[in-house]
């Protein structure tokens, strides 16, 4: 029960920011509406361009929602050094998507995903932090963040031999995550397209 409560609290951390950015988008849309603002909202005016810039900033949390959840969850779920846990989760998520990109690049026909067409022209793909990868959306982010947080909680305080002391703490967590993310990425390449087909089929 305590674990469920902690997970619920962790999920709330990123969600709480949605309200602010939603308000920003609401004001930007309102002030760019010619019906309300008249000629002031003409596309060539400074007013329109200014609120277009504000609007672009308002979309940041929704455009990068996966990264927000990946970083946000460990801040509440890590038993110690939550900052290091968040950084490890971010690194793990980037490695996960980079491995997926490399696998799909090397075996495009096996997994039915051609990255050469670009993410805009291919269903089920997305660019995350500049990495073309499978669109595992929030679910993928939560799973990867959970795995990395578990690794962090288990191995962050692990004492290594003195000659390997430089690899303790955060570095050790990231090292383990590197080798864990490779099979996780491979499994995702096999399983996720099937899940997408089941989800999108009528």
Residue ranges with predicted function:
Residues 152, 183-194:
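Hydrophobic alpha-helical membrane-associated segments
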